[in-house]
C-alpha cells in the first residue's frame, strides 16, 4: 500500500502518526530537498493550507496544486474546504476525491482514528476504500 501525505503542518504530522505503520511518504514544499515521492500512490492525503483571503473565504489553490502534482488513485482532502469544492475539483481534474475533514484543525494533537466514526464524503466506492485503508493496518 503506497500512501502519500502532502503537507506536514499540524494536520499532516497528526495524520503521519496515525498512519505510521503504513510508512507513508511525506511531501511538504518547505522541505523540497527531502522530496522522495514515488510516481504513483494508492492514496494521497492532502493536508495543505486553505487560507482566508479577501477574494476567497477558503483559498484552495494549494489543494488544486497538490492534486495536479501528485499521482494517486484516490485523493483524500483533509484541508478545510467550502461545501461543493470537492465536486468542483473532481470535475476539473477528473480525479477520485474523498473529503475527510479534520476534527481539530490547526490545534493540539487529537487521534482521529480513536473516534467511533470518521466523516468521509465522495463516491461511495472511493469512501469504502479509504475506510478499508485503516483495517489494513496491523493492529498493535
Locations of regions flagged by a protein language model:
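Surface-exposed, flexible loop/turn segments at secondary-structure boundaries
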Residues: 11, 32, 52, 83, ...
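NAD(P)+-binding Rossmann beta1-loop-alpha1 motif at the extreme N-terminus of oxidoreductases
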Residues: 1-40
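Short, well-ordered alpha-helices that flank and scaffold nucleotide-derived cofactor binding pockets
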Residues: 17-21, 68, 87, 91
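Rossmann-like NAD(P)-binding element
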Residues: 35-74
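Short, well-ordered alpha-helix to beta-strand connector turns
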Residues: 23, 40-42, 72-73, 93-94, ...
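Rossmann-fold dinucleotide-binding core
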Residues: 48, 81-140
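Small/polar loops that bind or transfer phosphate-bearing groups
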Residues: 7, 77-78
Amino acid at each position: 500500500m503506497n500512501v502519500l501525505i502532502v503537507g506536514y503542518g499540524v494536520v499532516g504530522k497528526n495524520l503521519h502518526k496515525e498512519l505510521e505503520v503504513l510508512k507513508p511518504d511525506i511531501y511538504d514544499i518547505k522541505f523540497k530537498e527531502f522530496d522522495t515521492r514515488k510516481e504513483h500512490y494508492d492514496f494521497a492525503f492532502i493536508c495543505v493550507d486553505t487560507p482566508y483571503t479577501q477574494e476567497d473565504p477558503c483559498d484552495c489553490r494549494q489543494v488544486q496544486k497538490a492534486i495536479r502534482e501528485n499521482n494517486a488513485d484516490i485523493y483524500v482532502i483533509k484541508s478545510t474546504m467550502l461545501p461543493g469544492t470537492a465536486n468542483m475539483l473532481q470535475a476539473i481534474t477528473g480525479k477520485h476525491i474523498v473529503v475527510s475533514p479534520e476534527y481539530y484543525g490547526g490545534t493540539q494533537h487529537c487521534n482521529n482514528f480513536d473516534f467511533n466514526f470518521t466523516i468521509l464524503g465522495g463516491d461511495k466506492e472511493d469512501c469504502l476504500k479509504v475506510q478499508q485503508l485503516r483495517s489494513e493496518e496491523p493492529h498493535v
